[in-house]
Amino acid sequence: ALVVTGFYIPKAAQPAAETDGPLGALEVCMALRAIGGDAWLVSDECCAPVIRPSALGFLPDDHVLIAPNANPKGGFDAWLNGVIDLAKTEHIDTLVYIERVGPARDGSPHNMRGIDITEWTAPLSQLTLLGLHTIGVGDGGNEIGMGRVEDYAIEGVVDHGENIACTVPTDQLVVAGTSNWGAHALVCAMRALGSNAVDPYLEPTWQERVLDVIVEYGGLDGVHMTNVATVDGLEPDRYFKQVGQLTDCARS
């Protein structure tokens, strides 16, 4: 699978990728590899300073793919062609987006504050052109995958919904309180179906360790826009309680 993540926060005091997304994406990658599959983590150059070094403690170097931004356009097109070749060579059949912003009706990606962030965002929704089975995980309405519900579940429901709602659908969509929780739910589903090999990644202690690594490399809480080991403004106890509850459900 190709597992795509990275949501850049350009208006922070220290601009960087947020903590929601990379943690869940790494969990999904590790789980897929544990059950005998393979996974490549995909992001873009603005998010790379956080995501690449965080991932390299868990994945081989050639399994972390960083896209250039769309300008100059030729650079992204060449990168995309390389991924197309990789998908054919490695028989990749699934594309998973976890907290990855996508284009709204105006063709541009917007953050939850309604700001156009095209300048800092590679057009990774174009990976859907590969024709793979697609899964989207999101929490705010502006993520790739939300095109399945944008007409009736986003506009008028979230702030700036009419401007930020992503129009790109995926075959399956997971909507969660945080996208990391949605990714964790996917791995919990693997466990519930009998894949005990994913057990190490279900533990809150493993999640805490990965979150600390992401923050060490500059990851930001997406709500507070600060370099702290929290996700979407949630207190750690509340955040990891949900992780533990999902894990317990998968093992029951």
Spans of features found by a protein language model:
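Short glycine-rich His-centered loop
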Residues: 2-17
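Short glycine-rich anion-binding loops that position phosphate/pyrophosphate groups of nucleotides
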Residues: 7-9, 100-103, 140-141
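Histidine-anchored nucleotide/phosphate-binding helix
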Residues: 15-36
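A short helix->loop->beta-strand "cap" motif at the edges of active sites that frequently abuts
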Residues: 37, 129-134, 142
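Short internal beta-strands
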Residues: 37-46
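Hydrophobic/aromatic beta-strand patches that form the interior of the parallel beta-sheet core
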Residues: 40, 94, 133-137
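An acidic, phosphate/nucleotide-engaging active-site surface
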Residues: 51-128
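C-terminal functional extensions of proteins
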Residues: 141-252
